[in-house]
Every structure is written in C-alpha cells, then in structure tokens.
Amino acid sequence: GSEMCIRDSGYTVVYRETKDPKYLDFAQKVTDVYLDRLPEDKVPYWDFDDPSIPNAPRDASAGAVVASALLELSTYLPNGTGKRYKDAAIEMLTSLSSDSYQSGESKPSFLLHSVGHWPNHSEIDASIIYADYYYIEALLRLKRLQEGYGVLG
C-alpha cells in the first residue's frame, strides 16, 4: 500500500511539472491498479501483498496521500476519467473521516491506524504527523474543487 501510494502521487507530480503525457498515462495505470486492490472502505492495507489480509493493518497515511493525489490527478483528465478518481478520493476521505479512523479526543492527531515502517516494527497502527498533513491537504483540495478552483493554491 505505502510504496504504491508514493509512486501514484509521484507520477502525478512529475506530470504536473513536465506536462509529458507519458507520466499522466503511467499515473493512471498505477492508480487503476491501486484502486482495484483497495478493500471495501477504500483505506489501504499497509502492504497489498500481506498474506494476513484481511487482518493486515491498514495504513491511513497511505490513504491520505493517495486521496490528495487523486484529487490533483482528476483535474488533468477528461470529466469521465477525472470524475472516477475524484469519486475514489471522496470515498477514501469519507472513510478517513469516520469514527473508525478519527482519533477524536484520544490523541493529539486526526488520524489513527497508520503504518510507518512495518519491517522495522516502527509506528504500527499509529498516528503519524504526515498522515494528518496529507489528510488536511486532501480536504483542502476537495474544498477548492467544490468551490470551482484548482487543487493547487
């Protein structure tokens, strides 16, 4: 989940900076594979190949990064394709905003259930600051789109 989310958002940024259509095409291909592998609530497992799925830890940080990237990616594509990615981002943000993933008053953070570095047993099922950063970024991007602006402010 986490490594694939970085590639997904990375190719969107490369396309933004270069306007080379091969990066936009690749971003879509990576994104389509990513979206097809998500569980029902659209919050990824820490690793899509974990043999313990569906009991593997979820990674809210990866979900937040991808939701933000999907909103940007949606603006570079025709309405049909772009809408699919925007809708997927909204589904992810809806799950991330639910009681299942929000810390409420229990921690000084927004999101629960992120994974920092599973192989090193570091930050497993934790609140991670960059998860909150990308979650807020995604919410702001969605708000800007809903108000008729671009995602980049």
Regions found by a protein language model. Give the residues of each.
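Short, small-residue-biased leader/transition segments that mark boundaries at the very start
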Residues: G1-I6
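Membrane-embedded hairpin module used as a gating/binding unit in multi-pass transport
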Residues: R7-V13
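Generic signal for short, ordered secondary-structure residues
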Residues: V13, Y45, S114-W118
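A beta-strand-loop signature enriched in Asp, Gly, Thr, and Trp
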Residues: Y15-Y85
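CBM-like carbohydrate-recognition segments
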Residues: N55-G153
